[in-house]
Swiss-Prot record:
Name of the protein this chain belongs to: (+)-delta-cadinene synthase isozyme C2
Purpose: Responsible for the cyclization of trans,trans-farnesyl diphosphate (FPP) to (+)-delta cadinene.
Originating species: Gossypium arboreum (Tree cotton)
Membership in a protein family: Belongs to the terpene synthase family.
PANTHER family: (+)-DELTA-CADINENE SYNTHASE, OS04G0344100 PROTEIN-RELATED
């Protein structure tokens, strides 16, 4: 187990006032009520499943079939990916892209094809040089004015630029250049290109949640005159089949949550189990990860309760035995806790006990020990923040960052996400993850800094809480906006680290790395306009509605 810190001496006396005023939190109740308790009665009928299989084979054949040129091949693969069905054809797509990588045709060198090829190959780990874009610059080093009329090319360059890594100045310039010209052009474009551009300016492919983006692109793709009818029909059926599976999972989780009765027992805590499931379905949506999704949703739900206990209700005196109990991970510790803490402590241990039972048949109990240790470290970091708040202590920015990165919970979620994966995860995977590799560091920075900006900018943090933005402003004598800009630069740098870690050869299989990529994507979607989890913003409501409530008309 992780080393104990709950008895660590503090630098100043701590209050022992039994009547200490508790932190105030006033979270809105769940906007979903009991809506997801029951799964829709209508199952996928046998005829639809048979049609799904027929279309799947048709699409598979089209992926591997020769096409007139690489542009057509790239565009078809891109459509398969953006419609959310590429998980069915992983090997076929990889083989086709490897062939394209080794057989580049310079004759197809327009901006659209160059950018699309660059993006798809980068997405799959190929180290394509950004020098391929130099031919679109003039002698002064600026992008040629002639490319501004090629909206499709600009859009692809814009999307490709989000795959950039450190030192690729031309792609940093491309983001600004394409954003400016696409923003100017969008109002004069015809549908569906206008919708593609408008949506892209709000959400890039690289940083969007695959299922949310697939749901949106389905509505765009069907309006493209040259769309492939078999692919479109397959994607629609596949979306509805996945939606039904996800609804069944969420119904099961909601029943578990309702039985815990935390709304009554812990009224200070956020009731966000539906949003938690949406978060985790962003981490992995594929059918083979059903068990992992359910386990990880329960973990994020309990982590949210633990967070609110530290941050929104418990006194520091109560948090000492609470942290100690989590460190010891023993149900016997429950007798040392205040009455209101007992239900959540028992539920926390029960979630991990169930996890152990579920993975035991495959001899994977060792994975749960890593997951427990990650949760313990999270609780220890929460205790440090609670001590700072009690003492009204303002740490330096670097001191704050060292503790705040673990408190965002992303290292814990990344490690725990591996528990529910198959044989691709090994003991070496957990040893690697426990050593804080760059991609987990990067996704954690994205989470922490986006959360900090959102909480401060949209006033989502209590006045007595220690704020990273306030620490930075005070230490460096800058305005709030200047601090936001610095934090956002850290986020952009972290995204470059994420992209770098996908370039072959990689430390870990892509499926392992995808967990951290998708965790970062969740933050980009939910926290760009405030804390979309706690305050259930437009992105969360829209995503949950489109992915879990509204089926696609066939």
């Amino acid at each position: 187990m992780a080393s104990q810190v709950s008895q660590m001496p503090s630098s100043s006396p701590l209050s022992s006032n039994k009547d200490e005023i508790r932190p105030k939190a006033d979270f809105q109740p769940s906007i979903w009520g009991d809506f997801f308790l029951n799964c829709p009665d209508k199952n996928i009928d046998a005829g639809t499943e048979k049609r799904h299989q027929q279309l799947k084979e048709e699409v598979r054949k089209m992926i591997v079939a020769p096409m007139a040129n690489s542009t057509q091949k790239l565009a078809f693969i891109d459509s398969v990916q953006r419609l959310g069905v590429s998980y069915h054809f992983t090997k076929e797509i990889e083989d086709e892209l490897e062939n394209i990588y080794h057989n580049n045709n310079d004759a197809e060198n327009d901006l659209y094809t160059t950018s699309l090829r660059f993006r798809l190959l980068r997405e799959h780990g190929y180290n394509v040089s950004c020098d391929v874009f130099n031919k679109f610059k003039d002698e002064q080093g600026n992008f040629k004015s002639s490319v501004t009329s090629d909206v499709q090319g600009l859009l692809e360059l814009y999307q490709a630029s989000y795959l950039r890594v450190h030192g690729e100045d031309i792609l940093d310039e491309a983001i600004s250049f394409t954003t400016n010209h696409l923003s100017l052009a969008v109002s004069s474009l015809d549908h569906p290109l206008s919708e593609e551009v408008s949506h892209a300016l709000k959400q890039s492919i690289r940083r969007g949640l695959p299922r949310v983006e697939a749901r949106h692109y389905l509505s765009v793709y069907q309006d493209i005159e040259s769309h492939n009818k078999a692919l479109l029909e397959f994607a629609k059926i596949d979306f509805n089949m996945l939606q039904f599976l996800h609804r069944k999972e969420l119904s099961e989780i909601c029943r578990w949550w309702k039985d815990l009765d935390f709304q009554r027992k812990l009224p200070y805590a956020r009731d966000r189990v539906v949003e938690g499931y949406f978060w985790i379905s962003g981490v992995y949506f594929e059918p083979q990860y059903s068990l992992g999704r359910k386990m990880l949703t329960k973990v994020i739900a309990m982590a949210s309760i633990v967070d609110d206990t530290y941050d929104s209700y418990a006194t520091y005196e109560e948090l000492i035995p609470y942290t100690n109990a989590i460190e010891r991970w023993d149900i016997k510790c429950i007798d040392e806790l205040p009455e209101y803490m007992k239900p959540s402590y028992k539920a926390l241990l029960d979630v991990y006990k169930e996890m152990e039972q579920l993975v035991a048949e495959h001899g994977r109990q060792y994975r749960v020990e890593y997951a427990k240790n990650a949760m313990i470290r999270l609780a220890q970091s929460y205790l440090v923040e609670a001590r700072w708040t009690l003492q009204n202590y303002k740490p330096s920015f670097e001191e704050f960052k060292a503790n705040a990165l673990p408190t965002c919970g992303y290292a814990m979620l990344a490690i725990t996400s591996f528990v529910g994966m198959g044989d691709i995860v090994t003991p070496e995977t957990f040893k690697w993850a426990a050593n804080d590799p760059k991609i987990i560091q990067a996704s954690t920075i994205i989470c922490r800094f986006m959360d900090d900006v959102a909480e401060h900018k949209f006033k989502h943090r209590r006045e007595d809480d220690c704020s990273a933005i306030e620490c930075y402003m005070e230490e460096y004598g800058v305005s709030a906006q200047e601090a936001y800009d610095v934090f956002n630069k850290h986020v952009e740098s972290a995204w470059k680290d994420v992209n770098q870690e996908f370039q072959k050869p990689t430390e870990m299989p892509t499926e392992v790395l995808n967990r951290s990529l998708n965790l970062a994507r969740v933050m980009d979607v939910l926290y760009r306009e405030g804390d979309g989890y706690t305050y259930v913003g437009k992105a969360a409501k829209g995503g949950i509605t489109s992915l879990l409530i509204e089926p696609i008309a066939l």
